[in-house]
From Swiss-Prot:
This is Uncharacterized protein PA3568. Pfam families: ACAS_N, AMP-binding, AMP-binding_C. Belongs to the ATP-dependent AMP-binding enzyme family. It comes from the Bacteria. InterPro entries: ACAS_N (IPR032387), AMP-bd_C (IPR025110), AMP-bd_C_sf (IPR045851), AMP-binding_CS (IPR020845), AMP-dep_synth/lig_dom (IPR000873), ANL_N_sf (IPR042099). Gene3D superfamilies: 3.30.300.30, N-terminal domain of ligase-like (3.40.50.12780). GO terms for molecular function: propionate-CoA ligase activity.
């Protein structure tokens, strides 16, 4: 079938369409109940099916003759090391680690927090949990102890898996003290912390609680994969939302397996034996879907990269990896390409490497600007594809489907909806909008397999946040429009979540931290455009009358406060002191207007504004800040 035929069938007959895709999986018990509608508007896929995600990623590939094929390539320019894991070797190491977890009492349904850098042991930890039917929650190593503590308290893990340190191009980041601090802050206390010791900064272990990873492996017996129900959770991934505790996105086993296999083959055009490079961190959804589970379930070789686009050692790092490992296709965020372009504007380093193996480049995670796309296409000579998805969906919503005949592209768009997704645009009253009219991007229910259907321990919050605004639709939180041919154009977030270098961060959470400062009377944090990172946060602060603090000192203290409580990845570096903030007559801060002023866009004072003269004051304050 062509793309248009597949998409039409997936919308008209979702159960039949996804039943066909599910037949390509090796289930322990194939599902007969494909799609079930629940009274609250959510849906359940493959409810009576039984499978194991680690089995599909490893054992099944060995059974199909790929045991000696390379499953994972570890490339670490920050340590100067490389390693290759065949499917057999990776399966054996995962099975032994699963046995070690089992010996510590980890079983089906137990949660395990994984707080690790980009080392193969992070992927092994995920797969070992899946092998036992345990639920992993990977927390990005850049998060501060306070954020890690929130996730520990929400997931209540039996075990924390960590490494002694992570490595940047210019420094060593000791992880163990961060974990120790998080456990001091957390109410819930896991039974043990298992530590992968790295020679760059060995960690001190607390007797009775902390365990050496290698010692645990040495005493373990390998564990076989445990069949679990399709709807049993595979992992929890925490994502930034509005103020309050982070949202724990729950991914099921069966729907996820069907979806990521379909995505890797259909969207990215990858086949068994191909070399795929998903450039991200295992702490993000891309790391789950496109570094670990998706490529391995399709029999591909996945590249596991511990480095940066630049300074490890230079702007040719990506092209070296492509040449050395014969990468066929890759995924990265536009921020990475902008960083490379900034250091190598004429593409001189690209020319030094043989990119003959490379077929496609896929970019997502933030808006892809046309100049970055054109630069990349010009210097690599390969097609560059924009596409769009979310942590909540787990796999792309709109994308070119390279693996299907009849796909086409349109510059400036994130391409058409992938089969399974019925994307529409609605106005504020929930009415469908015609072509080229901007509104709220929504997805008509049912969501396809792989999409989150609940939040960990807070189903009412899921219903309110995602299904409550537009009955019968999933609300993406993004605004945009469709053209007359169904191509989707994403214009940005409609809530308080901003995209910093491909990381979704809540300005509301940053506001909470800024407001803690004793000199701050009121504040607003907004996302402003940044040439390199896509967006960065900007703090607008009203001081208390008796604050008695210089603006420069205040900025230093607020930057340190946000860095300590959220992490350096927030990129919170700019603070502007203002006399007052613009509000509606009901007291709501006009953040959308503030964003337009900060970005130099035209704006109109809304009819609900309390005092329009404040807008001129804000403009003047931002001009002074830029001039300074």
């Amino acid at each position: 079938m062509t793309y248009l035929q597949q998409h039409a069938r997936s919308i008209a007959e979702p159960a039949a369409f996804w039943a066909e895709q599910a037949r390509s999986l090796a289930w322990y018990q194939a599902p007969a109940n494909i799609l079930e509608s629940l009274p609250d508007g959510t849906h359940r896929w493959f409810a009576d099916g039984r499978l194991n995600s680690a089995y599909l990623a490893l054992d099944r590939q060995i059974e199909e003759g790929r045991g000696e094929q390379t499953a994972l390539i570890y490339d670490s320019p920050v340590t100067g090391t490389q390693d290759r894991y065949s499917y057999l070797r990776l399966r054996d190491e995962v099975a032994r680690l699963a046995g070690a977890l089992r010996a510590l009492g980890v079983g089906k349904g137990d949660r395990v927090i994984i707080y690790m850098p980009m080392v193969p042991q992070a992927a092994m930890a995920m797969l070992a949990c899946a092998r036992l039917g345990a639920v992993h929650s990977v927390v990005f190593g850049g998060f501060a102890p306070y954020e890690l503590a929130l996730r520990i308290d929400d997931a209540t893990p039996k075990l924390v898996l960590t490494a002694s340190c992570g490595l940047e191009f210019d420094r060593v980041i000791e992880y163990k003290p961060l974990v120790d601090k998080a456990l001091e802050l957390a109410i819930h206390q896991p039974a043990h912390v298992m530590v992968w010791q790295r020679p760059q900064a060995p960690a001190r272990l607390h007797p009775g609680r902390d365990l050496d990873w290698q010692d645990c492996l040495a005493a373990a017996e390998p564990a076989d994969p445990l069949p679990v129900a399709s709807g049993d959770p595979l992992y929890i991934m925490y994502t930034s939302g509005t103020t309050g505790k982070p949202k724990g996105i729950v991914r099921d086993n069966g729907g996820h397996a069907v979806a990521v296999r379909y995505a890797v083959r259909t969207i990215y055009g990858m086949q068994a034996g191909d070399v795929w490079w998903g450039i991200s961190d295992v702490g993000w959804v891309v790391g789950h879907s496109l570094i670990v589970y998706g490529p391995l379930m399709c029999g591909c070789t996945t590249v596991f990269y511990e480095g940066k686009p630049v300074r490890t050692p230079d702007a040719g790092a990506y092209w070296r990896v492509i040449e050395e490992h014969r990468v066929n296709s890759l995924f990265c965020a536009p921020t990475a390409i902008r960083a490379i372009r900034k250091e190598d504007p004429h593409g001189e380093r690209v020319k030094r490497y043989d990119l003959g193996s490379l077929r496609h480049l896929f970019l997502a995670g933030e808006k892809l600007d046309s100049s970055t796309q054109h630069w990349l296409e010009e210097h690599t000579g390969r097609p560059v594809h924009d596409h769009w998805w979310q942590t909540e969906t787990g796999w792309p919503v709109t994308a070119p489907c390279i693996g299907i005949a009849g796909h086409d592209l349109r510059a400036g768009s994130t391409n058409r909806a992938v089969p399974g997704y019925h994307v529409q645009v609605l106005d504020d009253e929930g009415r469908p909008l015609g072509a080229n009219r901007q509104g709220a991007i929504v997805i008509a229910l049912p969501l396809p397999p792989g999409c989150a259907q609940t939040l960990w321990g807070d189903h009412p919050r899921y219903l309110q946040a995602y299904l409550g605004n537009y009955p019968g639709y999933y609300h993406t939180g993004d605004g945009g429009y469709l053209d007359e041919d169904g191509f989707v154009y994403i214009m940005g977030r409609t809530d308080d979540v901003i995209n910093v270098s491909g990381h979704r961060l809540s300005t509301g959470e940053m506001e909470e931290r800024v407001a803690q400062h004793q000199a701050v009377a009121e504040c607003a944090v907004i996302g402003v455009r940044d040439e390199l990172k896509g967006h960065v946060p900007l703090g607008l602060v009203v001081l208390k009358d008796d604050a008695g603090i210089a603006a420069e000192q205040l900025q230093r203290e607020l930057v340190a406060l946000v860095r300590e409580q959220i992490g350096a990845l927030a990129c919170f570096q700019r603070v502007v002191v203002v006399k007052r903030l613009p509000k509606t007559r009901s007291g709501k801060i006009l953040r959308a207007v503030l964003r337009k002023i900060a970005d130099g866009e035209d704006y109109a004072a809304p009819s609900t504004i309390d005092d329009p003269t404040i807008l001129g004051e804000i403009e003047a304050a931002l001009r002074v800040r830029k001039a300074g």
